[in-house]
Amino acid sequence: IVYVLAQVAGCILGAWLAHAMFELPILQASTHVRAGPAQMLSEGVATFALLFAILFVSRWKAEAVPPAVALVITAGYWWTASTSFANPAISIARAMSDTFAGVRPADVPGFIAGQIAGALLAWAASVALLPKDRQT
């Protein structure tokens, strides 16, 4: 639970820092509507892609995980309707940013539901498809 709280706090502080860098009010609440099945599906797909990439790449070359994460998140920005948050902590923090990147607080539970579904599917796919031991 400490790890989860640290992630949420770090994401919120990051949003506030971004506001300060762009001379925006530090404390905001998003009004950017991101509701509906397409957004939830997009977050599920983005989270699946991110976690499966981590699990896949780490089986062969652990040091390649950071660039793989960067590539999946960058690509997900372009190929998902939600712009690929892929992390509940980010979804919570983006509810505190009334910018294009923001998400209305009422829409956050749908994002998190999609992310949980994507995470569970990525885990199941990794168990079914990937070797159990690290490959060299």
Across the structure, where does each feature detected by a protein language model lie?
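Membrane-interface helix-loop junctions and terminal tails of multi-pass membrane proteins
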Residues: 1-136
